[in-house]
C-alpha cells in the first residue's frame, strides 16, 4: 500500500526533493484510509469491542502487569463510544468525572491520558490537538470503525445492484461483518450512559442490514444465504418477529417443512414467555402454508 524505495530504486533516485515530498504526502494520504480488513496490514494496536473487550499490541494481548489499569481502559472505551476521533476533553470529562469540578476533572483527564499513552508505549496512538482527543487510524485499528464502513459499503452495493451482479462482493462484505459482530458493543460490561448510544446504533444498523441483505438473497433465489442472515438476526435479537417470518418463508421455499415449523414453535414460545404475546397474523399465515405443504407431502 505504501510507496517505498524497495519497490523501484531507480524511480526514487531520479526524483527531485519536491517530488519526494509529494510521495511522502501521498503515503500519508493513503495511510489515513487503511484497508477495511485487518489482514495484510499490521497496526501497532488493535481494539476489539464487539463482544468481549480485547486490546492487542503488536498482535499480542497487552501486558498490564500486576494490576489492570482500570481508569485508562475506561477512558479508552469511552473515547471509542463517543466516536474515537476529535472528541473534546470536556465531553470525556463530563462522561468520566461528572461530579468533579473543572480543575479536578482536567487533572484527572491529563493524568489518565498520560497513563493510557504510557500503557501503549507509543505517543502516536493517541493524539491530543486543540483540546480534542483522537485515536490515530494510521496506528490503531478499531473493530467498530471497520464494521460501520463495511455496512456502509453493503448499503452502497444494495442501492445500485438490482440484478445480482455484485452478489459475490456483497457476500464477502457480509461475511466480514458477521465475523466482526461477535456480540453487542462492550456486551460483557455494564451498560453506561456513554456506551448505550453506540451499542444501540450498531445493533440497529446490523439488524437493518441483515434484513435488507436477506431480502436481496431471497429476491435472487439464494435461499441458504438468506437463511444465514435471518439466523444471525435472531442471535442478535430473538424478539424481532420478522426474522422468524422470513426464516419460515425460506424453509417453505426450499421444502424444508420440518425446519420451518420448528422456527414457528420457537417464535411462539419466545414471544409468549418474554412478551406475553401471540405471533402476528403474517406469521400464522406462513405457518398455515407450512402445514398445508406438510399435508401435501404426506399425501404424495
Residue spans for each PLM region:
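Short boundary/linker motifs that mark transitions into or out of structured domains
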Residues: 3-73, 123-134, 183
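Short, charge-rich, low-complexity alpha-helical interaction segments
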Residues: 118, 122-123, 211, 215
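Conserved RecA-like P-loop NTPase ATPase core
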Residues: 55, 76, 92, 116, ...
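Intrinsically disordered, charged and Pro/Gly-enriched terminal/linker segments
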Residues: 1-5, 15-16, 64-73, 81-84, ...
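Short capping segments at the starts of secondary-structure elements
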Residues: 79-92
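Active-site-flanking beta-strand signature of metal-NTP-handling nucleotidyl enzymes
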Residues: 48, 77, 147
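DNA-recognition element of transcription regulators
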Residues: 52, 67-77, 96, 102-121
